[in-house]
Amino acid sequence: MIRRALVLLVRIYQRLVSPLLPPACRFYPSCSAYAVTALQRHGALRGSWLTVRRLCRCHPFHPGGVDPVPELTPKR
């Protein structure tokens, strides 16, 4: 339930806010696409943590590049 709400918030950002801003993300996939994938793959808690970590790295002094969402690791 929370995961869906967070994904919806990111989708709203992608549709309404992002088109008004110049492209600035230094990574592929974009930070918002990364957030959606992280939330869908890892759930609300870990997906949010991965998204915050990614957003903290997205600044002019970081080289950027390809940064995919980590795969799920099986529980032992």
UniProtKB/Swiss-Prot annotation:
InterPro entries: Membr_insert_effic_factor_YidD. It is a peripheral membrane protein. One of its GO terms (cellular component) is plasma membrane. Disulfide bonds: none annotated. It comes from the Bacteria. Could be involved in insertion of integral membrane proteins into the membrane. Belongs to the UPF0161 family. This is Putative membrane protein insertion efficiency factor. It comes from Anaeromyxobacter dehalogenans (strain 2CP-C).
